[in-house]
A protein has these predicted regions:
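Helix-to-loop junctions at the C-terminal end of transmembrane segments
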Residues: 67-79, 273-287
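Helix-loop-helix hairpin linking two adjacent transmembrane segments in secondary transporters
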Residues: 144-195
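Cytoplasmic membrane-interface "Motif A"-like loop-to-helix N-cap segments
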Residues: 77-87, 282-297
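Juxtamembrane intracellular "pre-TM" segments in multi-pass secondary transporters
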Residues: 2-10, 194-226, 424-442
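Conserved MFS/SLC helix-loop-helix module at the cytosolic interface between two early adjacent transmembrane helices
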Residues: 66-105
Length: 470
C-alpha cells in the first residue's frame, strides 16, 4: 500500500471516529436540554412546585460542574473511549429511569445519572480530536465540535417538544434513552484508537493533585477565565434549559411552535458568532476582557428591554433577546483562552476544568433562585403570571453584577502580573487611537501625511502582529 493510500485510510478512520464522537456529544446536549421543554408536563406528572422542577436541572448541572476536574484526571488515566462509552450508557439508563418514574425522588436520581454521563462526553471528544488530527486542524475541529453540539438543542426544541405534546411522558423519554443506547453502540464500534492510559496521573499522590488545582486557581488569569465563563453563558443556559419555554408559553402566551422556534435562534447565532469571536480574540488578545464585558452588557440590555416592556413583550423582542444572550455562548470560550494563556501545559487541563465550572455554577444558582421566586408568586393552582416570571428573571442582574465586578478585579490583578513581567497594557483609548491610525495609514498609503506612530516597545504599530491584551 502506498503512503498516499495509508494517509487516505488514516484520514477516513479519523473521520469515522470523530463522527461517532460528535454523535455522542450531540446526544449529550440533547439529554442536557430535553428537560427544558418538559417543565410543565413534569410539574403535572410529579405534582411538583416550580422550585422542585428547577431542582431537576440544578441537580444535573451540579453533578456536571462537580465532575469537570475529576473527568480531566480520568481522561489521562483511562483514555477517552472508555469514558464516552460509560457516559452514553449512564445517560441511557438515566433517561429510561426518568421515563418510568412517577415520583419526585426517583426522577431526581435519574437526572443525577444523566448529568454524570453528560459530564464525561465533551472533554473526551476534544481529547480525541487532539489525537486524531494534525495540530493545524485541531483548532478548527474544536470549534466545529462546539457548533455541531447545538444540533442536540435543536432536537430538544423541535422534534422532542412535538413528540412530548403528541405522545406520553414514558414514550417520549424512552426515545431519548434509545438515542443514548445508539450512541453507546456507535462509540463501541467506531470511537477507537489513540487511548493512552496515562502513567503520569498514577504517579500523582492526592496531595499533588490538590496542589495542582490550588496552583491553577492562584493565578489571577485562571480566575479571570472562571469569572468570564461565569458571566457570559448563564442567561442563555437558564433560558434554553429550563425557564425560557414556560416563560414564553405561560407568561407570554406564545404557541408551542413559536416558543420552540425561539429556542432554535440560539443555534443559528452560535454558528455565526463563534467564528467572529474567534477572529476577534486571535486579532486582539490583550482586549479579550472587553469582548467579555460587551457580551454581558448586551445580554443585560436585552433583558432590560423585555422586562421593562409594558405587559407581554412582542415576539420580535424575544427574538432580539435570543440573539443577544446567545452571543454569550461563544463569548464564554474566551475563558478557556485565558486558561491556556496563563497556565503551563502541565496544569492546563486543571485550569480548563476550573474555568468550565464557572458557567454551570452561575446557571444552576440562577435556575434554583428563579424557582424559589416563582413559588413566592404562585397563584395557588400551579400557574405563574407574567409578572412572576419577570421578577424571577430580574435575579440575573445580581449574577451579572457579581461577575462583572470579579472580572474587573481579576483583570487588574492579571495586568499587574503582566507588568511585573515587562508587558504594559495601554489604555483602551490609546489602543483605539492606534487602530484608527493604522486604518488611515492603509487608506492613504505610506507617502501621504506623517509617518505612523511608533509604539513604546519600538515596534511599528502597523505591524500585523496583534499587540492588544486582556
Amino acid at each position: 500500500m502506498t503512503d498516499a493510500a495509508v494517509r487516505q485510510k488514516t484520514s477516513r478512520a479519523a473521520w469515522i471516529c470523530y463522527t461517532a464522537g460528535i454523535f455522542a456529544y450531540i446526544v449529550a446536549v440533547f439529554n442536557r436540554t430535553s428537560f427544558g421543554v418538559a417543565a410543565v408536563p413534569a410539574a403535572e406528572r410529579f405534582s411538583a412546585s416550580a422550585s422542585d422542577i428547577a431542582s431537576f436541572t440544578v441537580v444535573q448541572l451540579l453533578v456536571y460542574a462537580g465532575m469537570q476536574i475529576p473527568v480531566g484526571v480520568m481522561i489521562d488515566r483511562y483514555g477517552p473511549r472508555r469514558l464516552v462509552i460509560t457516559g452514553t450508557v449512564l445517560m441511557a439508563l438515566g433517561q429510561a429511569w426518568l421515563a418510568f418514574a412517577t415520583a419526585l425522588t426517583p426522577a431526581l436520581l435519574a437526572r443525577v445519572l444523566i448529568g454524570a454521563g453528560d459530564a464525561l462526553i465533551f472533554a473526551c471528544v476534544l481529547r480525541k480530536v487532539a489525537e486524531l488530527f494534525s495540530a493545524r486542524l485541531v483548532p478548527q475541529m474544536t470549534q466545529l465540535t462546539g457548533m455541531l453540539g447545538q444540533v442536540g438543542q435543536l432536537m430538544s426544541a423541535i422534534p422532542f417538544a412535538a413528540l412530548l405534546g403528541a405522545a406520553t411522558w414514558t414514550q417520549s423519554f424512552s426515545v431519548v434513552a434509545a438515542f443514548g443506547v445508539l450512541a453507546a453502540v456507535l462509540t463501541i464500534a467506531f470511537f477507537r484508537g489513540g487511548d493512552n492510559a496515562a502513567g503520569q496521573v498514577q504517579q500523582l499522590r492526592p496531595g499533588d493533585i490538590g496542589r495542582q488545582i490550588a496552583s491553577a486557581w492562584r493565578h489571577p488569569g485562571t480566575r479571570l477565565g472562571f469569572w468570564t465563563h461565569f458571566v457570559t453563558p448563564f442567561s442563555v443556559t437558564t433560558f434554553s434549559m429550563l425557564w425560557g419555554y414556560p416563560f414564553m408559553t405561560e407568561g407570554l402566551q406564545f404557541s408551542q411552535q413559536l416558543a420552540s422556534f425561539m429556542l432554535t435562534i440560539n443555534v443559528a447565532v452560535t454558528l455565526i458568532a463563534a467564528p467572529v469571536m474567534g477572529r476577534l480574540v486571535s486579532r486582539h488578545p490583550l482586549r479579550r476582557s472587553v469582548l467579555v464585558l460587551t457580551c454581558a452588557g448586551l445580554a443585560a440590555g436585552a433583558w432590560t428591554l423585555v422586562l421593562a416592556w409594558p405587559g407581554a413583550s412582542p415576539p420580535w423582542t424575544i427574538a432580539l433577546l435570543m440573539v443577544l444572550i446567545s452571543i454569550g455562548g461563544p463569548g464564554s470560550m474566551v475563558g478557556f483562552d485565558f486558561a491556556r494563556t496563563y497556565n503551563p501545559s502541565s496544569r492546563l487541563g486543571t485550569a480548563t476544568g476550573i474555568v468550565n465550572v464557572g458557567g454551570f455554577v452561575a446557571a444552576l444558582i440562577t435556575m434554583f433562585v428563579m424557582g424559589l421566586i416563582l413559588d413566592v408568586f404562585e397563584d395557588g393552582h400551579g400557574q405563574y403570571s407574567l409578572g412572576a416570571f419577570k421578577w424571577a428573571f430580574a435575579f440575573q442582574y445580581v449574577m451579572w453584577t457579581v461577575g462583572v465586578v470579579m472580572i474587573v478585579r481579576n483583570r487588574n490583578r492579571t495586568r499587574r502580573v503582566l507588568g511585573a513581567e515587562g508587558t504594559v497594557v495601554p489604555p483602551l483609548r490609546s489602543a483605539l487611537r492606534r487602530d484608527w491610525d493604522r486604518y488611515r495609514a492603509r487608506r492613504t498609503g505610506p507617502d501621504a501625511g506623517s509617518p505612523p506612530p511608533v509604539a513604546s516597545s519600538g515596534r511599528n504599530p502597523n505591524d500585523d502582529e496583534p499587540d492588544w491584551q486582556i
